[in-house]
Design a protein with these regions (language model features):
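Conserved small/polar residues in nucleotide/adenosyl-binding loops
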Residues: 391-395
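Extended, folded cores of ATP/NTP-driven motor/assembly subunits in large transport
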Residues: 1-390
Length: 395
């Protein structure tokens, strides 16, 4: 039976060109370095250590060049524990310990980091101009070999800063780990299969106005893409009441409700877009002057001017770097009833952080496409919000 729906091949729309020397090169000549990230064990980090980890990330981001994208992708996939009984010298107690957890369900966590060098024009593009809708033109800026060399040097310095912190370990992914081999599926193939294991077969991707499917799995997407959706105050960590007492605190990261505390198959994506901070601040200065001129016609314009002025005052007085950011949770299930429960769980976890949960159905295909390893530069600019990165020497 012929498929009457409008269809195309993945090859014709695939945004990546090649993998060379451990870097992913897109058809728009964006260069991406990929890492596997080893994070501290949950429930073992103190409040002071969370502050130190946050400061280390800020220091590392500062060394990246303008028009770079940091994409941190945390995978949480339901699996069942399989004991390793083939180790040599295993005694009775060790074997009993392994068998005690046999087939016990758990949430498998993998963390990846993608650092992308793109161009000014690419960072400004919106969802109606991504690689799902157009062809490819290589920007003149990215053709300069010196640009690529400086970016790789910055990436190495970035990794060194995080590895020297003692809390986070980065391991550069090889070409085979990115593209895969005859025996192992690479992370790009795993993303299209929504699986951390080897993909047995290729899955069809269906995009409709109501939902998006990858094989039998239906996707649901919740986004944090506006400052109005964020809580009034954000911290590096929070108290976990279930394991805390009057005398001791158990600390978790502020975003832990979207990580291991969310018991479903999901990916937590975090994006930081690093542009030219001085240009961004000058653009805000111009916007503030326009709002001042229009304030007599609308009180909302006057309020917006005050917010922009406060943002500029903070940035200039404290030496903050202007960046854009976006966060989303992409969950999936092959069962329609379970997906309804997952939607409620994700929304309630976001609400527990003080955020306004936004179930985004319109941009799910576009954001799924931008989440492809090495394709973060294809992210739609209108889905991000402006914020600041601490730029002081003790950050």
């Amino acid at each position: 039976m012929r498929n009457i729906m409008k269809a195309t091949t993945l090859e014709s729309r695939f945004p990546l060109l090649s993998v060379e020397h451990g870097c992913i090169v897109s058809k728009d000549a964006d260069i991406t370095a990929a890492f596997e990230v080893e994070l501290p064990e949950v429930y073992t980090v103190t409040a002071e250590e969370y502050e130190g980890i946050h400061a280390t990330w800020c220091k590392a981001i500062k060394v990246l060049p303008d028009h770079s994208v940091l994409h941190k992708q945390d995978w949480y996939v339901k699996e069942r524990y399989r004991p390793d009984l083939g180790k040599e010298g295993m005694g009775f107690l060790a074997r009993s310990y392994e068998m005690h957890f046999n087939e016990r369900p758990f949430l498998h966590h993998k963390c990846y980091l993608f650092l992308t060098k793109t161009t000014k024009e690419r960072m400004r593009q919106q969802s109606n101009w991504n690689t799902l809708c157009r062809g490819h033109i290589v920007p003149k800026e990215i053709q300069d070999k010196e640009t690529a060399v400086k970016f790789i040097e910055a990436v190495e310095q970035f990794a060194r800063i995080l590895n020297d912190s003692g809390h986070i370990k980065l391991r550069r992914l090889s070409d085979d780990e990115l593209t895969g081999t005859d025996k192992e599926t690479g992370i790009i193939g795993r993303y299209f299969a929504l699986s951390l294991g080897n993909a047995d077969c290729l899955e069809d991707i269906e995009m409709t106005a109501r939902e998006m499917r990858v094989g039998d799995n239906r996707l649901c997407l919740h986004t944090l893409s506006d400052t109005e959706d964020l809580p009034a105050a954000v911290a590096t960590d929070c108290r976990y009441e279930r394991l805390s007492t009057d005398r001791s605190d158990c600390r978790l990261s502020f975003a832990a409700p979207l990580g291991l505390l969310l018991p479903c198959n999901h990916i937590y994506n975090q994006y930081v877009f690093i542009g030219n901070s001085d240009e961004e601040l000058r653009r805000f200065e111009k916007t503030a002057r326009n709002m001042q001129s229009l304030s007599r016609y609308s009180r909302q314009n006057a309020i917006n001017r005050e917010w922009i002025e406060e943002y500029l005052n903070e940035a200039h007085s404290q030496g903050l770097k202007s960046v854009r950011a976006h966060f989303n949770v992409m969950a999936w299930s092959d069962d329609a009833e379970e997906l309804k429960r997952i939607k409620n769980d994700v929304g309630s976890q976001m609400a527990s952080m003080g955020c306004v949960p936004r179930h985004n159905t319109t941009d799910c295909p576009t954001l799924f496409w931008a989440g492809i390893p090495g394709n973060a530069a294809d992210f739609p600019a209108e889905e991000s919000f402006h914020t600041c990165l601490l730029y002081t020497s003790d950050a």
